[in-house]
Amino acid sequence: PESAMLFFSVAMLYFFSEWIDREGWWRFVLMTLCATLAFLTKLPTICLGLPLLYLCLQKYKLYFLTQWKLWFFATISILLTFLWYNHSNYIKTIDGSISNNTLSFRYYVFEYSIYLALKLSFYKKVFFSEVFEKDLIYAGGVLFIIGIIFTLKKKEFRYIHYWLLAILIYFFLAAKEVVWHTYYTIPIIVPASVFIGYAISNSLKLLTAYKVTGIKKIILQAFFIVMVVLLPLISYHKITGRYKAKRLEKDYPVQIAGKIVDETARENDLVIGCIWGGPELLYYCNRRGWTMDSNICSVERIESLRREGADYFVTTKLDVIDSSVIDYLKKNYET
């Protein structure tokens, strides 16, 4: 969903800025549609309201509060999002399971965000390991910082600055997910690309503007060239590294288990895939069914799904699942 989220987010920001400048109902409809779809794809994208607010203040000052079209836009996009997430939370509780309310500010901020924000490991994991190392692959990270420094006083970049700030706020509000799932930092790549592109395309102009001459100019020019050359080289290394056999070893048991089920089970059999809660086992089994977290796997939950039609229980986490659950399955079912 991250690709869809980025697409709708960028489209929302673009059409909103176009509507602010030239208005028009077709722009209004497109910006409202894209905003709603962005919020529905990933709830924290609501933080992108910050650059939208900046544009409103730029054009209307405080009189934006009297613009009924802005209120209509906010009401439609946020109300539809609220109704959907409220419904999805209700769906989770139908079978009696406990659901963490995805609309709960208290759940996100007071139970996780504040705690994580006070830990140095959070900043190292998110901003260095994920953003600087994986998302921007070192060279891009350096150019990103340079781009920010050189655009701090440029008003035409203020919109992008607020966009970046909104994403940083989102990192803290959704700190639990950002730390756990590496792909949650992907949204920063879009505004970062603007700053990186500015730093690269204006390197010579920037050197002239700041009156850098002599050996310093040569060193800085060489630095920019090295950064640009390193980007594709590091990218190639990162991508090919993910396909090395040693890195893929952890997925082999899941693939093997899935293949066995695919060859054994009937086409319409339903499967319980028990690893860490992800869908990989169902994917390799080529069957529909349910996912289950091996850390909280229980006899009660398994039996509940069996009554709903589950035919197979598949796992590669025998060392993680409670031994009493394994003993129960071996005693009562064919293994």
Sequence positions of predicted segments:
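Membrane-interface alpha helices of multi-pass inner-membrane proteins
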Residues: 15, 27-43, 49, 168-170
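Membrane-interface transmembrane helices that cradle and orient dolichyl/undecaprenyl
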Residues: 12-28, 38, 62, 151-152
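Short periplasmic/luminal acceptor-recognition loop of GT-C membrane glycosyltransferases, typified by
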Residues: 251, 255, 261-298, 311-318
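Hydrophobic/aromatic-rich transmembrane helices and adjacent perimembrane loops
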Residues: 2-5, 38, 47, 161-170, ...
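Transmembrane-lumen/periplasm boundary regions of multi-pass, lipid-linked membrane glycan transferases
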Residues: 37, 48-155, 168-179, 230-237
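Periplasmic/luminal catalytic loop of GT-C fold multi-pass membrane glycosyltransferases
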Residues: 140, 298-335
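Transmembrane alpha-helical segments
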Residues: 8-20, 31-34, 46, 50-57, 144-148, 199-204, 217-249, ...
